[in-house]
Amino acid sequence: HHEVLAKGFSAIRKMTDKKLSEILNAEENSATYNAIRKEFPSDDIKTTARRFFIFGILSDIFAKTTGFCGGVAGSMHIFFPPFGIFPSNAIVGASASIAAGAALFKKLQKKKGVVIANLGDGAAGRGPVFEAMNFASMKQFDSFWEEGYNGGLPLLFNFSNNYYGMNADTENETMSFSGDVARFGSFEEKGMKAEKVDGWNIPSLADA
């Protein structure tokens, strides 16, 4: 859940104290917030928000009602829209389609930022991922859309490769597995920017 934690902490760091207070005091977050205030009191709103975020995630993993999803999300489907974390689902790779829709919304609303679809190597051979990439690469974004709305979607597909898709060996089951970067880069006529990065090399990740 490193991507979820990173996104949540980034959102907390960037938000104003007023906005964080509104989120923490929202009725739908009362169970999580009340538990944090009781067990881990703090006068610093950002410290409280970080504790609230971690507690909400762990509560869902351990099936507690104080979780963001009432304890039903488990370890696979945690989400918290106020911090920009959209839901996953039970279909491998289908979060790519959700991300493409969220990116289209951002584009139409002229909102700043980029949508990131965090996917595993098992998703590299799934239809929903290819459909999302095809949608994100449509030529009409440049040729048909009016000024101010033209250009590609603010969308990044982030694949984490651990060499397993569920319980399968992705290297021997996925088409051109070793050439995924070149394959994904060929979606757009001019080439969708694609790059392979060593996940253990922090400077390379930051540069990418």
Regions found by a protein language model. Name each.
Residues 156-160:
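Short internal beta-strands
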